[in-house]
Amino acid sequence: MNMGDEIVKKNKYEIDMCNGSIMDKLISFSLPLMLSGILQLMFNAVDIVVVGRFSGSEALAAVGSTTALINVFTNLFIGISLGANVLAARFYAAGKDEEMSETVHTSILLALISGIIMAFLGVIFARICLELMDTPEDVIDLSALYMRIYFLGMPFFMLSNYGAAILRAVGDTKRPLVFLIISGCANALLNLFFVIICHLSVAGVGIGTVISQLISCILVLRCLYQTEGSYQLRFSSLSINMEYLKQIFQVGLPAGIQSTVINFSNVLLQSSVNSFGSIAMAGYTAANNIFGFLYVSVNSVTQACMSFTSQNYGVRKPKRMDRVLVDCMILSFVVSFAMGCGAYFFGPQLLKIYTEDPKVIQCGMEILVYTTVTYFLCGQMDLFPGALRGMGRSGVPMILSIIGTVGLRIVWIFGIFPAHRSLKVLFISYPASWILTIIMQVTCFWFVRRKVHRQLLGETAE
């Protein structure tokens, strides 16, 4: 019997990633995660819709123009949570209860510290960063106000993210979905209350978001606290295990740096959009929200690939790791191509959800033309780094993603775009960067896979 075949008894929320058929379990894992991401974006879209409908285009541009900047601040620490997910999945599959418990408590304390740091940095540097992005004068005050309120909720946001990463590591994506539905509905209702009834505009949306993050945090931590088993949270046991913290950083820090740098390129892109004025900014805000639905759909498959790979790496099943990647490639293509085509053909109708302004809709469609039907490329691009992170290899994929995605976009923004100033030309940089990065990531994966297979097969033989 292979190590880990029957080590861990699964409860009704968990998925056995190491035995049996793969595709149906990938779908069972990915679907709640996909729905969670879509619902989160729908609830975030409520922010945009409410301020756009009831506070005007300036408020809409103010909230939307902060997205890329907020992601630069937060994605470093969210990326580190992937390290917690990989390490926890590996220990859980191998039945190492003590190591699993240490990982949980290290991760939660790390999340709290990270959230406090993020809150401090966001409140202090919000306006300075917005000025560096050339945010127009007519929206910068509202943008800074929204960012400062938003960042006050960072401790809650980080705790719920890291807690959900632990649950995903054991195959539980259903309870985080339920928690999101509860907190998201609260967010939507609070937004309507603060904006329409209290007339707080952008500030009301920010306050509603912070309260909903607190609700999500309480639900996730309560779930971990009441869980019986190796991933039970005991507040008295919160401490940092330096060895496991190092392993979390080895996988998570490169992923976080990659995400942060990529979002920095999006900040440069946002600055380029800002140069077209508030109409283009509003169009980009609406299109970016639609674009986000595509991302969370394929990202759910990437998360599944990483978690499944990590657990099978923990129980030394290299051939099953290969089958996981192939099935993930098929699933990602089907999901991303179908949703991309839908977003393209129904683009005008989807954009009208956010605004009735025909000029804003026209700008939004110029962006969607080149970033929807081709989005399956992005899905395939992310799978290979996801599989490598599941094996504990994160450094080289980070470097290649930065070179392929960020490097090309910077060259595009400062080299090609100034000579051909249009939104269409600006956003062709997306599929171009995806193609370049795929070529590099596949080459890297091939060499690392051979090394990992030899290592695992050698250990199994011993």
Predicted regions: what they are:
Residues M1-S30, A88-G153, I197-L253, T309-T374, ...:
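Short alpha-helical transmembrane segments in multi-pass integral membrane proteins
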Residues N19, M23-M42, V46, L69-L76, ...:
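Residue-level signal for short hydrophobic patches within transmembrane helices
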Residues I27, L31, F43, I80, ...:
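Residue-level signal for transmembrane alpha-helical positions in Major Facilitator Superfamily
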Residues S28-D47, I149, S160, S183, ...:
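Transmembrane helical elements of multi-pass membrane transporters/channels
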Residues M42-A61, L130-E137, F193-L200, T260-F293, ...:
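Helix-terminus/linker motif at the lipid-water interface of multi-pass membrane proteins
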Residues L60-F120, F157-P176, G283-C341, F345-G347, ...:
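Small-residue-rich hydrophobic transmembrane alpha-helices
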Residues V72-N75, N187-N191, C217-L221, F293-V296, ...:
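Hydrophobic transmembrane alpha-helices of multi-pass small-molecule transporters
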Residues S81, Y150-R168, P176-N187, V205-V220, ...:
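Short runs within selected transmembrane alpha-helices of multi-pass transporters and secretion channels
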